[in-house]
């Protein structure tokens, strides 16, 4: 494995869009790429035990926030549950791909745990911020979360974190995020 790419950002800001673009571009250079999510097991638990239908509507997001943070991280005091499981998966399978992209990074330990496990040279962090264009000016994108969901720690805990790269996602202009994806790949190549 060459690198783990960790992508963070607010809900609906383009984390998965960037992950898919990076995957496509890296694969075009002959790399094997896997996209996964820290919430992989959380979503399976929500579907199997909580009758979640897989939709990230108001109720679905509320369930995931409560189950993932309020129950697992806080009530059960298992802050490493999500990151630990995915890092174990990566450790087991790391000889089968070049890059793994995790596109739902929400907490500092979801950055520091893989750094401790695999080394700083193997982890690259990206923050995606989405904007709308209004009269030629960039204005912050407003997602569909409720005010309470927007204030949830899973949406705010990395607001002041220092990332390796900051990506702009301009609504209706995928050229910008594509440009940033090329810059990220150039930086990754420069580190190799």
Question: Predicted regions: what is each one?
Answer:
Residues 24-34:
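Post-Walker A helix-loop "phosphate-sensing" segment adjacent to the P-loop in P-loop NTPases
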Residues 86-145:
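ATP-dependent NMP and nucleoside kinases share a basic, alpha-helical "lid"
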Residues 124-192:
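Small-molecule kinase domains that catalyze NTP-dependent phosphoryl transfer to phosphate-bearing small molecules
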Residues 18:
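Hydrophobic positions on the alpha1 helix immediately C-terminal to the Walker A/P-loop
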Residues 15:
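Conserved lysine of the Walker
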């Amino acid at each position: 494995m060459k690198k783990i790419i960790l992508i963070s950002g607010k809900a609906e800001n383009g984390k998965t869009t960037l992950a898919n673009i990076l995957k496509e571009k890296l694969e075009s250079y002959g790399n094997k790429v896997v996209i996964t999510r820290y919430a992989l097991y959380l979503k399976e638990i929500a579907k199997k035990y909580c009758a979640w239908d897989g939709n990230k509507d108001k109720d679905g997001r509320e369930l995931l926030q409560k189950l993932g943070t309020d129950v697992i991280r806080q009530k059960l005091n298992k802050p490493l549950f999500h990151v630990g499981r995915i890092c174990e998966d990566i450790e087991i399978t790391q000889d089968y791909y070049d890059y793994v992209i995790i596109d739902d990074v929400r907490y500092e330990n979801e950055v520091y745990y893989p750094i401790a496990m695999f080394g700083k040279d193997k982890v690259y962090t990206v923050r995606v911020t989405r904007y709308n264009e209004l009269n030629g000016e960039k204005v912050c994108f407003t997602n569909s979360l409720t005010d309470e969901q927007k204030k949830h720690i899973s949406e705010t805990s990395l607001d002041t974190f220092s990332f390796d790269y900051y990506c702009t996602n301009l609504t209706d202009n995928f050229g910008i995020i594509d440009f940033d994806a090329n810059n990220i790949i150039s930086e990754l190549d420069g580190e190799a």
